[in-house]
A protein has these predicted regions:
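A C-terminal functional module that forms or caps the active site or interfaces directly
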Residues: 93-105
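Short, structured beta-strand segments at or near domain termini in extracellular proteins/domains
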Residues: 134-144
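C-terminal, surface-exposed recognition/capping segments
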Residues: 103-136
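Extracytoplasmic/periplasmic beta-strand context in beta-sandwich domains
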Residues: 33-35, 111, 138
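Secretome/extracellular-domain signature
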Residues: 1-89
Length: 144
């Protein structure tokens, strides 16, 4: 969150980061894109999940803000465990709300702006590589 002094007619560049793209199978996810306002205030995209082995993965770290008067970090995604518990991780939350939940046959897309997508699991152990949910796109909120 930041406050900028502007003069009517001033132009500021706005970049809205894309959410991390979905992946299928026991692989690491994709990072989210960075958002920025005027090249001054930045919201870095969240980091991908990290596959440690075929049976577990670490949730990705939340994105880090900089350049604002108040810099709020995004939430970390949940770890996934598949050995005996068969739990996949949910996507990390953002300032705007929660991430996507994990799901059988496919993870759920991030719900709130800037949140992560959930992991997928194969409830029938069929060997099908189901897709994770996409991360939600970032946001740049401006009030005049």
């Amino acid at each position: 969150l930041g406050w900028l002094d502007v003069v009517p007619g001033t132009t500021l560049s706005v970049v809205v980061g894309k959410g991390g793209a979905s992946v299928s199978g026991a692989v690491s996810g994709n990072d989210g894109g960075d958002s920025s306002l005027g090249g001054i205030i930045f919201g870095r995209g969240g980091k991908k999940s990290n596959k440690a082995s075929i049976v577990n993965s670490a949730g990705g770290d939340g994105g880090v803000a900089s350049g604002g008067d108040i810099n709020i970090q995004g939430g970390t995604g949940q770890d996934g465990q598949a050995a005996t518990n068969m739990l996949t991780g949910s996507g990390g939350a953002s300032f705007w709300g929660g991430g996507g939940r994990s799901g059988a046959t496919g993870g759920v897309k991030g719900k709130a702006a800037g949140s992560g997508g959930g992991g997928a699991y194969d409830i029938d152990f069929s060997g099908i590589a189901y897709p994770s949910g996409d991360g939600a796109d970032g946001i740049v909120h401006i009030e005049w």
